[in-house]
Amino acid sequence: MSPGRTEPAIPDAHLAPPLLRRADHALALATRHALATQRGDGSWRAVPDPRITETALCTLALARSPYPGADRAAERGKAWLVAGAAPQRHHPVAHAVETALRSLALDTGEPVDVSHPAFTDRALSARARLLASVALHTARPTRGGAEPAALRARLAAAVAAPERLKRWTQVELWSAHALVELHFGDRAAALRATRLIADQQSPAGDFFANPVSTALAALALQAAAPGTAATRRCTEYLLASQLADGTWRFVSSDVWDTALTLRVFRGAADFDDRGAGRAVAFLVAAQNPDGGWPYRSGVESDNDTTAAALIALAGPRGAPAATLRAGLRHLADQQTPDGLWRTWQSAGDPPVDDVIAHVVTALDRHVDRHRVPVAAARDWLAGRFAQQGRWHAGWYRGLPYATAEVLPAFDAAAHAGGHPAARALAATRNADGGWPVEPGDPSTPVATGLALAALERGGVHDATYGTQGLRHLLRTQRDDGTWPGVPLMYGPRPLLTHFPTQNHALTADGLFAVVRRLRAAGGTP
């Protein structure tokens, strides 16, 4: 496999025909790879790249476990962390979290620093709470954040609150509560928390296949309920899920990845013949009883994945009408009084641009099947652009993703020369013809693919952008049809993860966009 094929310069006078042939060949390679990686059940599910967060937490949990083999697994985790794992730097909280977790796993003794003002953001404050709880449990000093007594009070109040939380978030909250109560000597309170934790454990020993939740639960269980079946199963799961390189990986997302892949590749003849039907069947089967879809099989529905599934299932040869009606009813039920949608069915979860846009787009695609009002949501998105000069996605980093995913909620034809968001994105192109994740960054294939898709959706049809962006994708495509990727998806926010399946689909999305433009123009951009 080569890192990328070198594309010879193409004389402008003879540009379109050879460029279209090369683009068609690149699409064939990309489609072939998508079909080759489809699973037997019709889904796509990729193992994300390693990062410090999961490996450090799992290493820490096993290093403190007396279970046979735990010490050897912890040493393998430490070896990977020592070998050059670097904390993420795109966001101060991400950097602080990974710096602290690496230090805790390697027992280097530095204070756990949660002093950055960004930790006070409502969506990120739980990260400070997690770090402070683990630091207290391991007798590590902290810099910033709540004093131990205040941390204890906040955790106790959160545990007692009637607000609905994601189930894995609830496990993490109970785990932190148990660790802090143990620090203060209240073993009875800690034991009560571990019973609640154990009630959420799967037969395999994990908690929603999430290594972060499972490692935190392991710390709490082995400290407050040593020797119990729940503690043993949790430890056994951590041992079994460690990969050969010593790492643990973030949770996979088969439903989300399948909806995205189906959305992007549907319409390619080979894909429609060999993959689309099985993907549709998988999504239909993955629908939850409440009508929504989960980001991965077996967990609760979220509005982003529900909208993504409805978008992917729109059009001919889609899902049964009953499936679509149930999904639309779920979105109708999830609409907040102000006409918006959260990502999760959780109290306090704020609305974010990409989720609102996905829901509006899904409802637009099925407009004849529902009466859900979307004007307030569309106005909210327009207001966000007016206030900020751009959109910010809640679940993926970067201007290209936010622009590409929000624009379908608007009518590009309403703006002569294209939507202002698309024009602004076009102007961020780098000299090599590609686009960066954020202005000033180097070009990446996924940002370039997203930008090309956004220009199509935003009505910007300048031939230069399409031609140069396409050349960048042709130049960087590997022989197996894939492209090099970068961490792009947030989870848990603000940490980033790289999912190869998502990188492939989002990059190919731009390739499809340019090819459609070339074909519509009769072979010229």
Outline where the language-model segments fall:
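Buried hydrophobic core positions in alpha-solenoid tandem helical repeats
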Residues: 34, 77, 81, 193, ...
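N-terminal signal-anchor module of multipass membrane proteins
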Residues: 30-40
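Short linear, low-complexity motifs centered on an aromatic residue
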Residues: 181-197
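An alpha-helical repeat/solenoid feature that recognizes helix-turn-helix modules
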Residues: 2-29, 44-75, 83-153, 161-186, ...
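Assembly/interface hotspot detector across virion components, adhesins/toxins, and nucleic-acid enzymes
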Residues: 36-38, 240, 287
